[in-house]
């Protein structure tokens, strides 16, 4: 039986990345793009860019929103895994709390960042469509400074989103590695060791993705291609595969964890009874001697 939360999260990651790939390929294959004109902030080229963005905004917006929901939906499987691996909070508490913090941080950051980016791009598209961006120095100057300013703001906002995406991959690396340690050090394993090793592969790809995102600032074209490939592999293959595999194991693992938790509780209760009995006997002996 498949855990629904794992399957849902995996499907959302696949869908968001397919939409992102379609959106990016359309953007890359448009005929009017000129990298030199882009870096020179050529006003004519900038206006063409904003016309394209206004026409294709819904596809990019849909991909971004679904991606944010996918990261947030990842919280539910991670909370279940942490509860199972910690045996209801009785094992390696610090390690498993760290996993929860990383998962919650990645999900929250993506959601907030996506909301801020969507709001700023919608406002920028409104500016490009209805505001005067041609004549700032004088009424008929046709200086087009407004277009240059708008494009610079857009690049800065995109940079914010780039760093948010990079930090998400760093968080996923931490989650996968900590879960590997948790499973590897468990005597009676509830989740499979092979699944944990698959998570290590996911973590290594996540680090490569993080590095490629950061190094885009050094060489945008080269590292954007690397980031595109690693992100596609992560979101379409590794993360969904990791989640589907987890989904098949999780129901049985939760049942075993409940048994272990009950055993631990019974053991603690029995120990308490023995301690209380010993204390009572000591008090009785003391009273007799007195």
Locate the predicted segments by residue.
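Intrinsically disordered, low-complexity cytosolic terminal tails
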Residues: 265-290
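Hydrophobic, aromatic-enriched alpha-helical segments typical of multi-pass transmembrane helices
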Residues: 1-267
């Amino acid at each position: 039986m498949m855990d629904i939360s794992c399957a849902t999260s995996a499907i959302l990651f696949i869908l968001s990345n397919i939409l992102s790939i379609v959106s990016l390929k359309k953007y890359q294959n448009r005929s009017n793009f000129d990298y030199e004109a882009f870096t020179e902030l050529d006003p004519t080229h900038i206006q063409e860019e904003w016309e394209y963005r206004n026409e294709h905004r819904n596809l990019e917006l849909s991909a971004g929103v679904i991606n944010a929901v996918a990261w947030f939906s990842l919280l539910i499987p991670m909370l279940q895994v942490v509860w199972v691996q910690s045996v209801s909070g009785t094992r390696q508490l610090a390690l498993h709390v760290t996993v929860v913090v990383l998962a919650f941080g990645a999900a929250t950051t993506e959601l907030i960042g996506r909301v801020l980016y969507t709001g700023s791009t919608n406002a920028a598209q409104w500016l490009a469509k209805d505001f005067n961006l041609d004549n700032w120095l004088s009424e008929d100057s046709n200086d087009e400074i407004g277009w240059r300013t708008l494009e610079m703001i857009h690049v800065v906002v995109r940079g914010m989103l780039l760093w948010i995406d990079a930090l998400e991959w760093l968080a996923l690396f931490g989650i996968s590695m900590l879960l590997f340690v948790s499973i590897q050090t468990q005597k009676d394993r509830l989740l499979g060791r092979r699944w944990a090793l698959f998570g290590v592969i996911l973590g290594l790809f996540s680090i490569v993705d993080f590095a490629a995102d950061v190094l885009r600032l050094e060489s945008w074209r080269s590292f954007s291609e690397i980031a595109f490939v690693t992100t596609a592999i992560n979101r379409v293959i590794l993360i969904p595969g990791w989640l589907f595999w987890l989904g098949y194991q999780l129901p049985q693992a939760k049942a075993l964890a409940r048994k272990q938790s009950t055993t631990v509780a019974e053991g603690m209760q029995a120990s308490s009874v023995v301690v209380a009995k010993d204390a009572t006997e000591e008090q009785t002996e003391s009273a007799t001697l007195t």
